[in-house]
From Swiss-Prot:
One of its GO terms (molecular function) is dTMP kinase activity. It catalyses: dTMP + ATP = dTDP + ADP. Coiled coil: none annotated. Pfam families: Thymidylate_kin. ATP binds at residues 7-14. CDD domains: TMPK. One of its GO terms (biological process) is dUDP biosynthetic process. Belongs to the thymidylate kinase family. The lineage of its organism: Bacteria, Thermotogati, Thermotogota, Thermotogae, Thermotogales. It comes from Fervidobacterium nodosum (strain ATCC 35602 / DSM 5306 / Rt17-B1). This is Thymidylate kinase.
Amino acid sequence: MFVSFEGIDGCGKSTQVNLLVNYLEEKGIPYIKVREPGGTHLGEKIRELLITQEMCARSELLLFLASRAQLVESVIKPALKNGKIVIADRFAHSSVAYQGCGRELGPETVKILNDFATDKTYPDIVFYIDVPVNVAMERMKNQHKDRIEKEGKEFWESIRNCYLKMAKENENFVIIDGTRTIEEIHREIVKVFNAYL
């Protein structure tokens, strides 16, 4: 099974990834946790470029896709083949939202490129943790921000709207209200996850 977590920065996604991983550990369920960009030697080098270097939107997208392609071939496909559950802190839907909508490269264009980069390997479940942009921005106000996280409210609204549209169009999306407590969110995620097992 392949599970990804999506949402705008500040939604609490990474916290929930770690809680689900802890749950799998406790249950003795074999898994692998990956993050995007990154998760491989090449991916981590690309991550550093994406976070620190100024670049045009197309370059940004192509770097994300390169990292993703390597992650799928080197880590995700082998893990799935070996019966492990893959837990991804972001995956292909992030590019549709961030580069397709936020950077205005077009969601359909990004979807086509994602198909190529992932060899059409997609999550069985996408937990989309939804929070209003002002809530996410408030949560992040005292954190060090990378190049992308420094974008303005309009950028984040576009991304959130894109995620909500994808959630309506894809049966494997599960919308999670990210304004609730960490524990409430975790309980809902575990309940949905167990229903898929």
